[in-house]
Design a protein with these regions (language model features):
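Single conserved hydrophobic/aromatic residue that forms the stacking wall/gate
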Residues: 1-9
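Short beta-strands and strand-coil junctions in structured, solvent-facing domains, enriched
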Residues: 11, 64-66, 81, 114-115, ...
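Intrinsically disordered, Ser/Thr/Pro/Gly-rich linkers and terminal tails that flank
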Residues: 12-19, 26, 116-122, 130, ...
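Gly/Ser/Thr-rich loop/hinge elements
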Residues: 13-65, 92-98, 113
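Short, well-structured beta-strand/strand-turn elements
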Residues: 77-90
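Conserved P-loop NTPase
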Residues: 94-97, 105-138
Length: 166
């Protein structure tokens, strides 16, 4: 589930996201970054653990950064169904640089692109199945599984895919 994951981009978050995707994707590109000079850094998968079961990923407008790397790869490879609403659209890599006086500056150092080369910055990723969260649930602190119409739609999709496979 990448729904609600905000802008927590750090090197270890990218690495963790890529490690998760290496357990799912076929051989190929996971994501790549490109700096202002066009220098490209690729993150790849050997395909040794390709996931072959039904998969649904919940996304929304708070799904950003590493959550979009994950969702973008799943969508580009077609190995799962994105359910929910359009993601945030944060396709940049930022670094925080500490200054001598104790302050810090946040610098954008590169952009990232999905395996198909899609630039999602300020655009987001559209889900395969759009499901708005019920209005009555938007301000609730806790939402049960039974109430969560986006989750219920994802479960329904997985059940349909499972039945089709049998």
């Amino acid at each position: 589930m990448s729904r609600g994951l905000g802008d927590v981009y750090k090197r270890q978050v990218l690495d963790t996201c890529c490690e998760m995707l290496k357990q799912m994707l076929p051989k190929g590109l996971i994501v790549y970054t490109e700096d202002k000079y066009g220098q490209r850094t690729e993150y790849t998968c050997d395909g040794n653990n390709e996931f072959k079961k039904p998969l649904a990923v919940l996304v929304n407008g708070y799904s950003a950064s590493a959550a979009e790397i994950f969702s973008g790869a799943i969508k580009d490879y077609g190995i799962g169904t994105l359910v929910g609403t359009k993601t945030y659209g944060k396709g940049i890599v930022q670094r925080i640089v500490g200054m001598e006086d104790g302050t810090a500056v946040k610098l954008t150092v590169s952009k990232y692109f999905t395996p198909n080369g899609t630039d999602i910055h300020k655009k987001g990723i559209e889900p395969d199945v759009t499901v708005e969260l019920d209005e009555s649930l938007k301000n609730k602190v806790t939402v049960t599984e039974e109430e969560d119409n986006q989750l219920q739609k994802a479960i329904s999709i997985l059940q349909e895919e499972k039945n089709d496979a049998e």
